[in-house]
């Protein structure tokens, strides 16, 4: 009488475990890169929304203290709130955000976001900066590695 094999042998199970290990070794770093890229894109979008409020305030002739930015805090930013260095800062109440408020329509300004402890390890403590030219155009620049930079945000 022949006995029928039921189940898997130890060798077959070890091969499956090895294959899963190889796939995990490839997938986990790629997933971490994806997370870092998505976090940079998220902060770019969140801080980019402040441009409209700042531009509206500047064109309406409001000072930084009179202007409500309407910022929703981000858990990806960290650090102490720092006032802008060359002109009055618009208070966002968010640590990790620095705003150099343009005092006139033909003045320069910027929004600087510093990635904090909740951000992916590959992007902290890097920065993302929106800069306003004297002509009123905004450009994005960042200090994160090129592989994490979203479209429209170049090296700083």
From Swiss-Prot:
Record's bilayer topology term: Single-pass membrane protein
Protein name: Type IV major fimbrial protein FimA
UniProt superkingdom: Bacteria
Primary localization: other
Claim: Lipoprotein is one of the keywords in the record: no
Cystine bridges: 57-67, 140-153
GO-annotated biological processes: cell adhesion; protein secretion by the type II secretion system
One cellular component (GO) term of this entry: membrane
PROSITE patterns, per database record: PROKAR_NTER_METHYL (PS00409)
InterPro entries for the chain: Bac_GSPG_pilin (IPR000983), N_methyl_site (IPR012902), Pilin (IPR001082), Pilin-like (IPR045584), T4P/T2SS_Core (IPR050470)
Natural source organism: Dichelobacter nodosus (Bacteroides nodosus)
Lineage of the species this protein comes from: Bacteria, Pseudomonadati, Pseudomonadota, Gammaproteobacteria, Cardiobacteriales
């Amino acid at each position: 009488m022949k006995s029928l094999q039921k189940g898997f042998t130890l060798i077959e199970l070890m091969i499956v475990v090895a294959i899963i290990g190889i796939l995990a070794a490839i997938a986990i770093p790629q997933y971490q890169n994806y997370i870092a890229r998505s976090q940079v894109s998220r902060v770019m979008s969140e801080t980019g929304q402040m441009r409209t409020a700042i531009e509206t305030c500047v064109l309406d002739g409001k000072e930084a203290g009179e202007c409500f930015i309407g910022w929703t805090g981000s858990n990806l930013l960290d650090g102490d709130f720092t006032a802008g260095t060359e002109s009055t800062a618009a208070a966002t109440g968010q640590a990790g955000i620095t705003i150099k408020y343009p005092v006139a329509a033909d003045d320069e300004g910027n929004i600087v976001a510093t990635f904090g402890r909740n951000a992916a390890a590959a992007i902290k403590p890097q920065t993302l900066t929106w800069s306003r030219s004297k002509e009123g155009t905004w450009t994005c620049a960042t200090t994160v590695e090129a592989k994490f930079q979203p479209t429209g945000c170049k090296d700083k």
